[in-house]
């Protein structure tokens, strides 16, 4: 409990939520609309919006008036059993102090950029909201970054400040001389470091009195770096409208969160999904955000956490659910879990069914990008079509388009497009910062071209095929890599795979699979195993999709966000640099 005591002494606050309180029945079923804060509809465009004043401070007032149950706004734990519970009143106090540190101590102004590279620690929430209060543009980044990744982000963004931990401080120091815009370095640590400001002590001594800026809905709020699967990461710039979209009724239907919910998003803090799932979505509904520090991913710890804490909803990548299912537990019937959502990579229909069978909870799928947030999904309570990404979520009008922006009929392969004309929808990125060429490149007629390929069926459900650059044209047949990778994943030998096109003197292109084997299959004869895997794919999907070439590898090239870099493998196949 030493760390817990440090938090209490450090921030100078009392722990107002010593235990978890189930909401009174009359509050338990109240969603955002029931709390009287749903001021906008799906297609409204208010002139002003600020998540800190319109959401966080609203729930602070609800707590003062006794209109919200005494559950914490943020419930943070670590693997040592320490806990931090902050109410909305405490979050308002601490984020106002943070805002004053950023503006008064650091001298940052509205529109300045701040690089935020923190793990799942409470200070991540303070900095995010502190930036929103002041109009400082925050740029989340994963702690998996190396010095060259940090250098690139600091240089292209012109960041004036960075907030990180002592683990990454040496990496920052090694590149700081090459970043002339960087003026302020804030350290989140129990130890001081020369050349760095002590974030915690500054927040503790700062004034809690702060007037939130009156931000325009279309003023910039955050920059999210894309995954960089096809080149250097781009800076997708988002307005305050990105946070406003979580207010809209159609978006509320995706998770249908209540004040009594305890919501756990397992996304890395450097990804846009964390901003949505660990900040915007749950707090818009007045729910409790649950966070586990999880310095190392361990499915056993995740399972034990579900049993130990009253978590009601979960949002995580398919790999998280997959690893949970692979553990040898006699029961996965978590006592309070009601709803699960996933996205970010392909999910096998068999995995959805297995999750439902072992946990008794349905697993809903969603789709999005750094540019869009969650743009379509299977809403809670909606019919699940296993393997589908669900339907478009307003205000996004999503269609399947060709390369000229023409809408395609159902069951026809094309690009996933989001209508941007005559009006760009609230919640879609503004543009790629400092990259007008790329911004223009993704505009296709009346649509933003996501670069992802899919089909849409007669009921409006989308079916993902892959990135446009990833789709393989084999002997006239178009093959999406996700289809083949899903088929391979059903075989027990395959830990993970990446499917790309490979040159062939007769067919032009053929399907090739790079496969990482599970350890127990590593001693198998490669030739025999290749034939077995090829036959397996033929048996579970259209035979023309099977990989004519197979290469076993120890690992796959990935971006720092964990996405497979198929482009790198494809270039290798075609002898490109």
Curated annotation (Swiss-Prot):
One of its GO terms (cellular component) is mitochondrial matrix. Keywords: Acetylation, ATP-binding, Fatty acid metabolism, GTP-binding, Ligase, Lipid metabolism, Magnesium, Metal-binding, Mitochondrion, Nucleotide-binding, Transit peptide. It is found in: Mitochondrion matrix; Mitochondrion. Its cofactor is Mg(2+); Mn(2+). ATP binds at residues 226-234, 452, 467, 563. Monomer. The modification N6-acetyllysine is found at residues 146, 204, 214, 356, 391, 531, 538, 549. Detected in liver. Transmembrane segments: none annotated. It comes from the Eukaryota. InterPro entries: AMP-bd_C, AMP-bd_C_sf, AMP-binding_CS, AMP-dep_synth/lig_dom, ANL_N_sf, Mitochondrial_ACSM. It catalyses: a medium-chain fatty acid + ATP + CoA = a medium-chain fatty acyl-CoA + AMP + diphosphate; benzoate + ATP + CoA = benzoyl-CoA + AMP + diphosphate; (R)-lipoate + GTP + H(+) = (R)-lipoyl-GMP + diphosphate; octanoate + ATP + CoA = octanoyl-CoA + AMP + diphosphate. Residues 1-31 form a transit peptide. One of its GO terms (molecular function) is fatty-acyl-CoA synthase activity. PANTHER family: ACYL-COENZYME A SYNTHETASE, ACYL-COENZYME A SYNTHETASE ACSM1, MITOCHONDRIAL. It holds the Pfam family AMP-binding_C. Belongs to the ATP-dependent AMP-binding enzyme family. The lineage of its organism: Eukaryota, Metazoa, Chordata, Craniata, Vertebrata. This is Acyl-coenzyme A synthetase ACSM1, mitochondrial. The modification N6-succinyllysine is found at residues 85, 146, 183, 204, 237, 356, 391, 538. Its EC number is 6.2.1.2, 6.2.1.25. GO terms for biological process: acyl-CoA metabolic process; fatty acid biosynthetic process. Catalyzes the activation of fatty acids by CoA to produce an acyl-CoA, the first step in fatty acid metabolism. Capable of activating medium-chain fatty acids (e.g. butyric (C4) to decanoic (C10) acids), and certain carboxylate-containing xenobiotics, e.g. benzoate. Also catalyzes the activation of lipoate to lipoyl-nucleoside monophosphate. Activates lipoate with GTP at a 1000-fold higher rate than with ATP and activates both (R)- and (S)-lipoate to the respective lipoyl-GMP, with a preference for (R)-lipoate.
């Amino acid at each position: 409990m030493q760390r817990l005591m440090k938090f209490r002494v450090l921030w100078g606050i009392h722990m107002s939520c010593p235990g978890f309180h189930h909401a009174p029945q009359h509050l338990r079923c109240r969603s955002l609309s029931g709390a009287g804060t749903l001021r906008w509809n799906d297609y409204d465009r208010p002139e002003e919006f600020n998540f800190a004043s319109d959401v966080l401070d609203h729930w602070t007032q609800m707590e003062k008036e006794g209109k919200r149950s005494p559950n914490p706004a943020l419930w943070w734990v670590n693997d040592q059993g320490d806990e931090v519970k902050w109410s909305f009143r405490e979050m308002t106090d601490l984020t106002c102090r943070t805002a004053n540190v950023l503006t008064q101590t650091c001298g940052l102004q509205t529109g300045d950029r701040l690089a935020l590279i923190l793990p799942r620690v409470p200070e991540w929430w303070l900095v995010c909201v502190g930036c929103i209060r002041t109009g400082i543009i925050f740029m989340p980044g994963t702690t998996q970054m190396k010095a060259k990744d940090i250098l690139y982000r600091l240089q292209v963004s012109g960041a004036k400040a960075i907030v990180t931990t002592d683990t990454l401080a040496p990496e920052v120091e090694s590149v700081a001389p090459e970043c002339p815009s960087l003026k302020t370095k804030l350290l989140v640590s129990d130890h001081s470091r020369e050349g760095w400001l002590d974030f915690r002590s500054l927040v503790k001594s700062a004034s809690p009195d702060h007037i939130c800026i009156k931000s325009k809905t279309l003023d910039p709020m955050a920059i999210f770096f894309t995954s960089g699967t096809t080149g250097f990461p781009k800076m997708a710039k988002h307005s305050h409208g990105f946070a406003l979209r979580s207010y809209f009724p159609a978006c509320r239907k995706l998770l249908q969160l209540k004040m009594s919910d305890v919501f756990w998003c397992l996304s890395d803090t450097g990804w846009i999904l964390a901003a949505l799932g660990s900040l915007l979505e749950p707090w818009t509904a007045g729910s409790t955000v649950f966070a586990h520090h999880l310095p190392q991913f361990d499915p056993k710890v995740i399972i034990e956490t579900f049993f130990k804490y009253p978590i009601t909803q979960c949002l995580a990548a398919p790999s998280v659910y997959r690893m949970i299912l692979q553990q040898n537990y006699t029961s996965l019937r978590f006592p309070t879990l009601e709803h699960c959502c996933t996205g970010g990579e392909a999910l096998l229909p068999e995995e959805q069914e297995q999750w439902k069978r072992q946990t008794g909870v349905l697993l809903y799928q969603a789709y999005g990008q750094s540019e869009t947030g969650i743009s379509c999904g299977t809403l809670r309570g909606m019919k699940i079509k296993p393997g589908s990404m669900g339907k478009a979520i307003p205000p996004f009008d999503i269609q399947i388009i060709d390369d000229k922006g023409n809408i395609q009929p159902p069951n026809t392969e094309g690009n996933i497009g989001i209508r941007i004309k005559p009006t760009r929808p609230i919640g879609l990125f503004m543009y790629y910062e400092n990259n007008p060429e790329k911004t223009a490149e993704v505009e296709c007629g009346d649509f933003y071209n996501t670069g992802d390929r899919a089909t849409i069926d007669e009921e409006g459900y989308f079916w993902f095929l892959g990135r446009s650059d990833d789709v393989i044209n084999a002997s006239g047949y178009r093959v999406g890599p996700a289809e083949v990778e899903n088929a391979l994943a059903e075989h027990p030998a395959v830990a993970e795979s990446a499917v790309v096109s490979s040159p062939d003197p007769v067919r032009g292109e053929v399907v090739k699979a790079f496969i990482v084997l599970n350890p127990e299959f590593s001693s198998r004869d490669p030739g025999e195993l290749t034939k077995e895997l090829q036959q397996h794919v033929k048996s579970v999907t259209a035979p023309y999709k099977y990989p004519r070439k197979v290469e076993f590898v120890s690992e796959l090239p990935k971006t720092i966000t964990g996405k497979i870099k198929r482009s790198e493998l494809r270039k290798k196949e075609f002898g490109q640099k």
